[in-house]
């Protein structure tokens, strides 16, 4: 699902159920992203492990610009809240809220 925000900004959600595994213990593959006029700005996803995590540890992580760091997934509600909090913070920094 893609939702247009203000001007050239939009968010995209891709979520699907999968069998639970070491990397996706909650049984979801997800990608929640904020895009701007030139590129992706923010993303929460679990497509792959992120150092220092190993392949058999949770794949959940956060991208802010070119920085990637582990994200501590607790539940879907907290993920959505954390995502929207980060979106509004970044849009505010850019003078869009």
What is each stretch, according to the model?
Residues 1-58:
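The feature represents the first ordered module of a protein
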Residues 18, 35, 49, 64-66, ...:
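Short linear sequence elements within intrinsically disordered, low-complexity coil regions
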Residues 52, 61-64, 96:
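Solvent-exposed, non-transmembrane amphipathic alpha-helical segments
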Residues 57-71:
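Short helix/strand-capping connector loops at secondary-structure junctions
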Residues 67-97:
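Short, compact, well-ordered microdomains
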């Amino acid at each position: 699902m893609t939702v247009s925000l203000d001007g050239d900004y939009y968010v995209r959600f891709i979520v699907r159920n999968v069998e639970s595994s070491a990397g996706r213990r909650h049984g979801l593959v997800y990608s929640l992203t904020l895009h701007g006029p030139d590129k992706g700005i923010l993303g929460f996803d679990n497509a792959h492990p992120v150092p220092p995590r190993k392949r058999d540890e949770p794949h959940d992580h956060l991208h802010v610009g070119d920085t990637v760091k582990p994200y501590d997934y607790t539940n879907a509600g907290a993920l959505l809240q954390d995502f929207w909090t980060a979106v509004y913070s970044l849009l505010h920094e850019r003078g869009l809220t």
